[in-house]
Amino acid sequence: VNVRDDGYTQDRSSERVAAALGAEAGDLVVDVCAAPGGKATALAGAGAHVVAADLRPKRVRLVAGNARRTAADRPDSGAVWPLVADARHAPLRAGVADIVLVDAPCSGLGVLRRRPDARWRITANDVDELSVIQSAILDASAELVAPGGLLAYSVCTLTRSETIEVAERFADTHPGFEAVAPPEDPWIPWGSGALLLPQADDSDGMALFTWRRPLS
């Protein structure tokens, strides 16, 4: 776990996801599952403006609080606009975003070093149900990506069902989206995306897949 320059405490894996998106000043980013706000505030720190959505009002208030605290230490940061919304039905215009981040709800099996109880709480059926939700969110989020924009899917788990299989289903149903080459070391290739392994990066386990929407 690291403490960023703006004082926000965040696992290294989440920082690496935000960095891999390459957000620039003035970009419009939609983070559809934003709570507690670590990735959203990191992207705003790069100068991007971020719509930070989450399903539950309490979770969105958490994002808003973290955005206020981090912005106080970063006068040049982009705006963070909290939004209560179901990621499967976000009330946003199609093609609105330069970058859409789907940091989807998942089994959390990549964070066993911090939450070992998940080893006994999460069942195979849970993983299967989560993968259906993940695919639905990813499909809906693709509609928000502007031509030439980036769609990113990340989960703090290492199960094949929630990573490679979700990515393969998306690629099969969205042939116009082109897989982007995965980031380099310490990421390791995993299907069309990449993994961070706890033992290799001293971080949570994380998977990342990214696609580019064609210009036309």
Regions found by a protein language model. Name each.
Residues 1-216:
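S-adenosylmethionine
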